[in-house]
Amino acid sequence: MEKRGQKRRQPTAHLSCELCRERKVKCDKLDPCTNCASAGVVCIPVRRPRLPRGAHVQRMRRISPEDPEASIQVDVPSSAGAGAGIAVVDDLKERIRRLESLVDSMRSPTSQISNLDQQSRDIIELTPNELDDDSSSTHNQATIHLGDGSLRVLGLSGPSGLDVGWTSIIKDKDISIQLCQVYLLNVDPVIKILHRPSVERWMLQGERYLGFSERHSAVDALGAAICYAAATSLTETQSWARFHATKSSIVSRARRACEAALEKSNLLVSPEVTTLQAFVLYLVARRSEDPSRAVWTLMAFAVRIAKALDLPGGADETFFSQQMRKRLWLTICLLDFQTSLSRPSEPLISVAEATSSFAPPKHINDSDFGPKSSHDISDREGLTDTTFSMVSYHVQAAGRLLNFESSSTDKEILQQHVQQFEQKTLRLLFYCDPESTPYAWFTWHRIQCFVTGARLSAIRPLRHQHRGSTGHLMPSLDTNGSASTLSLALNILEKVQLVHTDPRGEGFRWFVTVPWQPLAVAISECYVCQDKTLIQRALPIVEAAFQQHKAAVSGTSKAISTTLERLMCHVREKLSPTLCTSISLTASPAFEIANIPSTLSVPHTPPSRSSITSNGDLLSNWPWPAPDLPHNGPDIASATEAAPISTSLQKLDPLLLSLDSQLVIAGQEPLMENDQSWAAWEEVIAGLHDGETTRPNMFLS
């Protein structure tokens, strides 16, 4: 029988789970709860004694030392009077009040950093007589020093504080190893900013990373960023197969852990390139799961930090360090270009700066060099670990010249930019067999998509020219310009659909989304095109791409979404009476993309190399006039002179043989006012830049 004076242990209660508490919704306290089960996320139950409420908070009760549930113990000497006990209580209440005010002010976006630093210093000024060493260390760990470069003031951690449970996904060795393997399969081939062998020795074999000390903040941030990027690249099927959990739960945990590690790494003032690598991976991963403007805003920090670390320079560095710096800088340039297109807005890095600093890394495999490499290594021919990334670097350089260079309004200059881009990128496909590996297949089709995109950008650039501008407008492609432009846009949309339907593209689907520019071109060309056969082929592709874009980027630029929605409504309204017998144009918002692949002309498996030249869907079979044109235009990057690709034609796949001498812009006639195709694109760009245009709308005529 218990003694009368002995305190009874407070029973453990089943409280609201973590997710319901954060979302501030009522939890039924089941295991798992109904809210988490319906949302498809992992339910984290909370079981602990209930905290005192109301008047009970004011009472000082001595907690039994053997009580394992006790989290705070305050001992008042028996010899002390009532006044001493009251003084201790008042002092503790004051510290709690100041700590709560500090937390509330940190959540406010308008808080002052200096005031927070002073408050945090005041709170942790504790004497040994007041709290023991363990309590003091707990306060020090819970204090966030914003003056040291913490990112909580930027809102990376969301509305709630950090939870120790979120970092367990990184500390779990088995999970981190699996996520690293996913990263090496899905992310590393397309975002090449890390040295693959060094990452394998570090995360898979347990060695130190590039000479850093154990538990270095920069290395911890990089490991968390790798796990976060890997989590976002998973498909739902892969997530269940590997982790027996939904993708959303894995991504949420990995993101919290990554943001916590970035806060501890002092990103804003850190001199380590590794910390910036972690932040860039964070931006890449967040951009794939979060269509809001967050990444577009945070890109300014990445660009500033890169310039502060002198990434474009670094001539005195070792060969290994030079390669890593070049990869990181050009990846930042690529992200800057991609985020500027998604809003749309001007890139942070100007065309002149991106061109002058364009120094691509070596086209080699990661196994060809290491941290101890003391000499340069020559470029390799054929497919390497860096082939796709090298093409991406050239894409952002050419894309800036075609879309954001104000002086490039002459058709010959634009033609030269496209030709130089094709020469540089197609050279990287020497001996590439698309049937060898999923990476080779993906690189093969994406490069064709990039070449088509460059040609489309030359014909329909993003530069907005108001009427009355002194610049020369782009001439029509040819007498059947609308059909040719529509074919270019359709090819891009089909290639995107191919990646999302072919099993070999499963690991890279996170990286490929429907680009709004080709989609807008395709919709506007469907409105003005007179070829009914081409329209019948195009509409299912356009409809599927529109629904996929609408579902994937909800929450992104309102101007883009509104413009595409308006264009699609006008096309459906105009073409429904004439094509209702062959295709339905009244698709509901729940349009199923899975029903579309049967109508696409893109094959799900690439043709054999013996029959590849007979495929009518390939770019090499498209009619492109080829009048003579001088090749003395400016280089894309003015960094290295590329040898003419015609000198090595015997090394190219037959698919690419006809691309050497093809021209993008043909026809010498000036643009006529009745060119409905160009007028339609002008209205699209005007709607993006000016909102609702006040000019006469041809889509309403």
UniProtKB/Swiss-Prot annotation:
Report if keyword Zinc is assigned: yes
Instruction: List locations, semicolon-separated.
Output: Nucleus
Q: What does this protein do?
A: Transcription factor that specifically regulates the neosartoricin B biosynthesis gene cluster.
For this UniProt entry, what is the primary localization, expressed as one broad class?
nucleus
Residues of the DNA-binding region: 17-43
Under the heading InterPro entries, the entry gives:
Sec_Metabolite_Reg (IPR050613), Transcription_factor_dom_fun (IPR007219), Zn2-C6_fun-type_DNA-bd_sf (IPR036864), Zn2Cys6_DnaBD (IPR001138)
Matching CDD domains, A to Z? fungal_TF_MHR (cd12148), GAL4 (cd00067)
State the species of origin.
Arthroderma gypseum (strain ATCC MYA-4604 / CBS 118893) (Microsporum gypseum)
- Any GO MF annotation of the entry: DNA binding
This one is known as: C6 finger domain transcription factor nscR
Instruction: Write the record's keywords in alphabetical order, separated by commas.
Output: DNA-binding, Metal-binding, Nucleus, Transcription, Transcription regulation, Zinc
* GO CC field: nucleus
Per the record, the GO terms for biological process are: DNA-templated transcription
Q: One Pfam family name from the record?
A: Fungal_trans
Please give the SMART domains that the UniProt record associates with this protein: GAL4
